[in-house]
């Protein structure tokens, strides 16, 4: 009932907005023509304010005419652009009714070469509310997955191939084209691994999202913008590549775009064929016993995926669109672990445990669909409505053997077989409304999401003649979660000052239902929760000088547990170590404040403080009265994080440019595993990333990049040693109109990207070290194709700009 009341109140509120938003509207009109006096349709019309920020965009109609209706008084500039023509920029004028008459655009020479490469952007661009890493401009971010390309983004670090961090803090919300994935943890990483980097235009790292976006993400938000061509006609790209590290890998991606009049159709297909290898060791002393192990892990899964969609302009005000994404990961896998077991105070080995996991069946299938409707009129009113549906089907079958030997003689065998299936069903509805109000911009909206995760685990002891079910480890778990959200947000410019304030309400209803057998009878364990949270956000900025600005932002954030972390199933890694979820896990809540200075769109200096309650992390913990170690998530206490960051773009000369990103951060954990084990740990750490681009003779471009991480505190009480990586890439464009691009890249030249960490408390010591296949040689070729009828792109910047603003 509470949710219904909230929805009715807000819908009633929407109906009254227009009464408050009627202000004095001024009309700007004109007609755009070419040198032959013919009308230019689909020219992009932009109105810029005194800070040179776009406040209104539209396109000319079939007669080349445009009309802007705007109500916020001030000084403005009119900018008109069209592919194949020189840009027109008016003199500064006060907002009033005004006709610009005929505006003639002078033509500029244009061929396919210019269509492909025009508007060249820096590798890293700095915007007031975001740092943008332009993946399509990077030499060594091509021919890999989105997951691998994300490692190159400034401020981003992926810890031990499983946790994405931003500016030294975990809890990052990932969006794709401004839309939430509804996935986290291993499922999100699988999704990123199935996306080719060639389909990505840029990563946008957003430090302080407004109330318009989900409150998830204590560290901020990363929006992945996919490529979508603006060229009329049929065009696309084909990328093929070979990667070699320990084994050979083959990468293939093809994408196309067809644009004609009001219709745009796009699609893509990609696959990754090859094995991935990992090597990791551990050295553990637990209750006086030594466990020294070495693991070789081979992931034999293949990746395949595709996308198809369309956008259709019904008229100048109404647009509809839809797309379908399919991602598949399938194949086998093998881990082989040798563990020497002995006494912690000597080098004498009592036993050797040889464990093998044969993942003879693995699959991950994800289908996601979206339907979008957009209305935008000349009064500044925008309506967006999204319907999302997705399914996530994951399953694996594993045969595990544990063979114990004493003095090279087999003393015991434990053989297991497990079947695990996860089916996740995701539904989402979202409504956003924007209008001019009191010489500012008012935004409000509603969102509803429904998640159902069905999990089925079967565990068997393999005997000589049959498999015997292990009731203790065989169970089903169903998790349902429904979130209803509503928000309001207002932003306004007052001379040199800009303010933004918002409030988001999210009500979460969830229940976990565990079914298992105990003494031959079925048992149930329910974990219901219902909670409502309010998430205020506020920012204020001032344009201190012509070239610099200063801003202060605050927001409250939430990080709900991932679905695997809530799943109480037991997953055996071997006889002496296993993973288990925690259905009692609570969301962690974070207060976050950021002070930021921006200079000339080339420098950002930031100072951020975050305070997290109910801090949660995965911990390694010894099981009492046994020699088994368990890896599980727990709510631990409080984490405080303060960070200082610097991002600097620099053009040294006409052939050398560089981008630097550095973060120094201090983490303080006041946490407890239980009432007897408390930790009060503090660690100062640094991360630096330098990327350099060189223009060389013979149409060559070189890229040299390096990343360094100092000693740091990760998770609750795990201290990791420093590591680093250097990559080098070479690129050359050739064929007619530079349609072909050939790249040669060497990643992690000296194999410095290895992990090495230690954690300890009384009676327990654990050291982990190893590496994934980071050192690789990659060769890939990209070919761009287009039909010969290209006259220039149909400008859809108004729609794209609004999607872009959704990530700010």
Where are these regions (language model features)?
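Short, acidic, small-residue-rich periplasmic hinge/interaction motif at the N-terminus
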Residues: 33, 44-48, 81-85, 99-139, ...
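Face-selective signature of the C-terminal outer-membrane beta-barrel domain
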Residues: 305-329, 356-515, 543, 547, ...
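Surface-exposed extracellular loop regions of Gram-negative outer-membrane beta-barrel proteins
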Residues: 509-514, 546-592, 607-626, 747-762
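Outer-membrane beta-barrel signature, preferentially recognizing the C-terminal barrel domain
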Residues: 358, 475-483, 529, 558-606, ...
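N-terminal periplasmic accessory domains that precede
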Residues: 100-104, 146-149, 188-191, 217-239, ...
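Short acidic/polar hinge/loop motifs at secondary-structure boundaries
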Residues: 146, 180-207
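Outer membrane beta-barrel strand-and-loop segments of large Gram-negative receptors
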Residues: 294, 426-430, 470-475, 586, ...
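Transmembrane beta-barrel wall of Gram-negative outer-membrane proteins
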Residues: 247-275, 279, 289-335, 365-367, ...
């Amino acid at each position: 009932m509470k949710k219904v009341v909230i929805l009715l109140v807000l819908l009633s509120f929407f109906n009254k907005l227009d009464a408050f938003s009627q202000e004095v509207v001024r009309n700007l009109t004109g007609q755009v023509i070419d040198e032959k006096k013919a009308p230019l349709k689909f020219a992009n019309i932009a109105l810029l304010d005194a800070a040179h920020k776009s406040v209104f965009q539209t396109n000319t109609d079939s007669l080349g005419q445009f009309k802007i209706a705007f109500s916020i008084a001030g000084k403005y500039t009119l900018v008109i652009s069209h592919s194949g023509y020189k840009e027109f920029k008016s003199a500064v004028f006060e907002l009033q009714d005004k006709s610009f008459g005929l505006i003639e655009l002078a033509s500029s020479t244009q061929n396919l070469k210019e269509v492909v490469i025009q508007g060249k952007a820096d590798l890293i661009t700095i915007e007031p509310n975001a740092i943008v890493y332009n993946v399509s401009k990077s030499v060594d971010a091509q021919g890999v997955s989105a997951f691998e390309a994300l490692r190159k983004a400034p401020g981003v670090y992926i810890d031990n191939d499983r946790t994405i961090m931003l500016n030294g803090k975990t809890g990052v919300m990932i969006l794709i084209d401004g839309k939430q994935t509804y996935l986290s943890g291993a499922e999100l990483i699988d999704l990123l691994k199935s996306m080719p980097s060639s389909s990505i235009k840029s990563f946008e790292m957003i430090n302080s999202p407004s109330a318009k976006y989900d409150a998830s993400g204590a560290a901020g938000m990363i929006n992945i913008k996919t490529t979508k061509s603006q060229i009329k006609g049929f065009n696309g790209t084909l990328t093929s590549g070979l990667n070699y590290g320990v084994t050979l890998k083959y990468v293939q991606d093809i994408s196309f775009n067809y644009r004609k009049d009001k219709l745009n159709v796009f699609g893509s297909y990609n696959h990754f064929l090859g094995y991935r290898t990992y090597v990791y060791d551990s050295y553990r002393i637990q209750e006086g016993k030594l466990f020294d192990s070495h693991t070789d892990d081979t992931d034999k899964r293949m990746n395949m995926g595709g996308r198809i969609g369309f956008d259709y302009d019904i008229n100048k005000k109404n647009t509809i669109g839809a797309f379908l994404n399919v991602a598949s990961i399938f194949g086998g896998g093998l881990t082989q672990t040798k563990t020497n077991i002995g006494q912690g105070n000597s080098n004498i080995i009592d036993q050797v445990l040889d464990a093998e996991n044969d993942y003879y069946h693995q699959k991950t299938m994800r289908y996601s669909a979206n339907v979008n409707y957009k209305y935008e009129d000349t009064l500044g009113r925008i309506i967006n409505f999204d319907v999302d549906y997705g399914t996530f089907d994951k399953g694996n079958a594993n045969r595990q053997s544990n063979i114990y030997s004493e003095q090279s003689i087999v003393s015991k065998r434990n053989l297991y077989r497990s079947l695990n299936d996860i089916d996740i069903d995701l539904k989402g509805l979202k409504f956003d409304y924007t209008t001019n109000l009191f010489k500012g911009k008012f935004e409000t909206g509603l969102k509803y999401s429904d998640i159902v995760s069905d999990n089925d685990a079967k565990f068997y002891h393999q005997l000589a003649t049959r498999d015997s079910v292990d009731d203790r480890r065989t169970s089903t778990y169903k998790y349902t979660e429904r979130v209803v959200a509503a928000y309001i947000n207002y932003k306004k410019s007052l001379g040199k000052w800009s303010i933004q304030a918002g409030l988001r309400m999210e009500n979460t209803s969830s229940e976990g239902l565990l079914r298992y057998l105990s003494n031959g009878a079925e048992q149930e364990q329910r974990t219901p929760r219902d909670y409502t949270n309010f998430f205020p956000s506020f920012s204020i900025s001032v344009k201190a000088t012509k070239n610099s600005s200063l801003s202060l932002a605050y927001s409250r954030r939430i990080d709900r547990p991932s679905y695997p972390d809530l799943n109480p199933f037991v997953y055996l890694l071997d006889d002496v170590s296993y993973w288990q979820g925690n259905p009692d896990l609570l969301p962690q809540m974070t207060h976050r404040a950021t002070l930021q200075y921006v200079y000339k769109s080339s420098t950002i200096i930031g100072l951020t403080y975050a305070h997290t309650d109910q801090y949660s992390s995965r911990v390694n913990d010894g099981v009492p009265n046994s020699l088994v170690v368990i890896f599980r998530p727990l709510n631990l206490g409080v984490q405080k994080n303060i960070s200082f960051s610097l991002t600097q773009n620099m053009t040294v000369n006409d052939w050398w440019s560089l981008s630097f990103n550095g973060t120094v951060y201090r983490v303080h954990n006041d946490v407890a595993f239980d009432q007897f084990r408390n930790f009060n740990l503090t660690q100062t750490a640094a991360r630096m990333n330098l990327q350099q681009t060189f223009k060389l003779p013979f149409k060559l471009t070189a890229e040299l990049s390096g990343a360094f991480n100092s000693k740091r505190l990760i998770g609750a009480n795990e201290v990791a040693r420093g590591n680093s990586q250097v990559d080098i890439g070479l690129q050359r464009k050739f064929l007619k109109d530079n349609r072909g691009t050939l790249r040669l890249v060497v990643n992690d030249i000296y194999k410095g990207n290895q992990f090495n960490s230690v954690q300890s408390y009384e009676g327990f010591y654990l050291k982990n070290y190893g590496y994934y296949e980071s050192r690789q040689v990659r060769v890939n070729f990209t070919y761009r194709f287009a039909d010969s009828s290209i006259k220039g792109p149909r400008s859809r910047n108004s729609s794209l700009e609004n999607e872009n603003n959704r990530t700010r």
